[in-house]
């Protein structure tokens, strides 16, 4: 989101005086006279009544008023500005409609970007602007990913507790519109826990698992099992379900659903979507072992009809998780490569062997080129002596 620098031509005293008069004229319970306690008290009074401009004002006019308030706020020293900033942030979350919420979002973004990057107040402003962004469907304008988020606070990292609170909020505001991003946020959240406090993260761990399972674009689920809060769920149904999605095939999920249908539904998971995902994961697992699969094998393993095989394979190829070729004439699928569902010691060993083979092949090529080069030099010398 673009942000413009804050600057007002009037002096602080003149700005305060004008703001007091403006809100007094709108009917707010505020004196038009400056406080003898200083500009900070003036700001407290002004912020306390600033929502009255939401009633009848035009968005452009309101934006100008809020801009003036922000221009005064950023002059307050850090040690005396926390309560003022927090009070202002709370007011900005009270916008009565979407157009005004956008104005409030712009104001908070302006405040965020004009605070010193080392100011701990930036965290509080950002938390509230995410709340406001949700109100006006602008979340992706202020949050595009975890890396971007961390860079925002590079000069003043929030505490683990603050980041946990922020990650939970970001999960809530993205889960209905961007499951992939929401899933990444939850994984980051679980990563903030240590062995000492992972046991208290049960609810967060369950949300993380459910979000990852529900995300149609998340297929590599194995890393979740290594997260400490997830380990504490071992023996619970949600952990059993995750384990099925990590390494089991479709029949295991079907059996689990038959035994625990109420549990799956209570987690907000869609059975049809689960079946679709498990079919794809099962296909990937089969592709790891079989470079060639018949249509009959796929109808049996994936529990689909014969006429559904080709459309299914085409959908799999669109994900780019598997490279394959359909052979309609012989009713077969030829596999070129596939992403592994799990990546453990066997896969690392396989990768090591592959790289070692490449290294040996490159050495052979280099040796061959050296021999060719030497032969050409010898030939050139011989021809030179003859002439």
Swiss-Prot record:
UniProtKB keywords: Cytoplasm, Golgi apparatus, Initiation factor, Protein biosynthesis
Protein's GO biological process:
formation of cytoplasmic translation initiation complex
Q: Does the keyword Protein biosynthesis apply?
A: yes
Q: What is its main location?
A: cytoplasm
Task: Name its cellular compartments.
Answer: Cytoplasm; Golgi apparatus
Q: Which residues form the PCI domain?
A: 181-340
Q: Which PANTHER family match?
A: COP9 SIGNALOSOME COMPLEX SUBUNIT 7/DENDRITIC CELL PROTEIN GA17 (PTHR15350), EUKARYOTIC TRANSLATION INITIATION FACTOR 3 SUBUNIT M (PTHR15350:SF2)
Q: Please describe what this protein does.
A: Component of the eukaryotic translation initiation factor 3 (eIF-3) complex, which is involved in protein synthesis of a specialized repertoire of mRNAs and, together with other initiation factors, stimulates binding of mRNA and methionyl-tRNAi to the 40S ribosome. The eIF-3 complex specifically targets and initiates translation of a subset of mRNAs involved in cell proliferation.
Query: What family does the database annotate?
Result: Belongs to the eIF-3 subunit M family.
What is the designated name of this protein?
Answer: Eukaryotic translation initiation factor 3 subunit M
- Give the organism, scientific name: Drosophila grimshawi
């Amino acid at each position: 989101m673009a942000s413009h620098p804050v600057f007002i031509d009037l002096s602080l005293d003149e700005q305060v005086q004008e703001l007091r008069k403006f809100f007094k004229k709108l009917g707010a319970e505020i004196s038009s006279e400056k406080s003898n306690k200083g500009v900070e008290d003036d700001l407290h009074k002004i912020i306390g009544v600033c929502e009255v401009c939401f009633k009848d004002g035009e968005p452009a006019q309101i934006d100008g008023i809020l801009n003036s308030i922000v221009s005064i706020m950023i002059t307050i020293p850090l040690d005396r500005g926390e309560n003022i900033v927090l009070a202002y942030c709370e007011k900005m979350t009270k916008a009565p409609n979407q157009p005004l919420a956008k104005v409030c979002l712009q104001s908070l973004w302006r405040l965020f970007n004009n605070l010193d990057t080392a100011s701990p107040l930036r965290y509080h402003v950002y938390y509230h602007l995410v709340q406001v962004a949700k109100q006006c469907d602008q979340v992706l304008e202020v949050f595009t990913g975890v890396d971007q988020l961390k860079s925002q606070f590079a000069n003043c990292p929030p505490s683990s507790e603050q980041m946990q609170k922020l990650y939970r909020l970001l999960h809530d505001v993205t889960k209905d519109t961007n499951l992939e991003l929401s899933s990444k946020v939850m994984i980051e959240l679980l990563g903030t826990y240590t062995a000492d406090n992972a046991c208290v993260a049960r609810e967060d761990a369950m949300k993380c698992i459910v979000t990852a399972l529900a995300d149609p674009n998340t297929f590599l689920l194995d890393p979740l099992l290594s997260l400490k809060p997830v380990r504490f769920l071992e023996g619970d149904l949600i952990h059993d379900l995750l384990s099925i999605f990590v390494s089991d095939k479709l029949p295991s999920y079907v059996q689990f659903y038959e035994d625990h249908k109420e549990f799956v539904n209570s987690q907000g998971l869609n059975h049809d979507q689960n079946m679709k995902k498990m079919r794809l994961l099962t296909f990937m697992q089969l592709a790891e072992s079989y470079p060639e699969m018949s249509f009959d094998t796929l109808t049996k393993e994936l529990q689909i009809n014969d006429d559904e095989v080709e459309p299914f394979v085409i959908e799999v190829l669109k994900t780019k998780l598997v490279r394959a070729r359909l052979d309609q004439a012989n009713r077969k699928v030829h596999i070129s490569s596939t992403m592994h569902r799990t990546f453990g010691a066997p896969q690392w060993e396989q990768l090591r062997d592959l790289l070692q083979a490449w290294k040996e092949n490159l050495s052979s090529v280099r040796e061959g080129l050296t021999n060719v080069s030497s032969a050409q030099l010898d030939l050139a010398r011989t021809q030179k002596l003859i002439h």
